[in-house]
Amino acid sequence: MLSDDNGSIHSKSITAPTVLPTITSAETNYLAFGILSTDYHIELYGYLQNKTGKLTVKSCDDYIIAQSKFFNPTLHTKEFSFMNPRGKTTNYRTLPTYIRNLIDHPNSDRNYTQEELKCSIELLIELCRLLPCN
């Protein structure tokens, strides 16, 4: 990585381990510069779903809660409900799912802070690191 220090260009290595199986600009920006992005959040959430086989949002939400070694209810709980067009209500409980759903289905009545995005990304990183690399 190159950095500009008052007009002097320096190179430095990124020593943080990557989480995702392929290099993405979102992950590189997070590891190198600490840049939070919805892209990285979605990449992590999708990777977690695929690697755990929890392909529905609800099953992934339940999986996240069950990871009690990393899931801290005080930090990571964000309860909300969603009613589908047929009138069925689904209740979700985790911050990562809350943010995932707002990214996927923007809603002007709800939002999240940069602190919540950071907290959610950090949890998703920990959960993804638990997964086998095959």
Give the residues covered by each predicted segment.
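C-terminal lobe/lid and adjacent interdomain/linker elements of RecA-like ASCE P-loop ATPase modules
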Residues: 1-74
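Charge-enriched, short contiguous segments at helix-coil
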Residues: 80-134
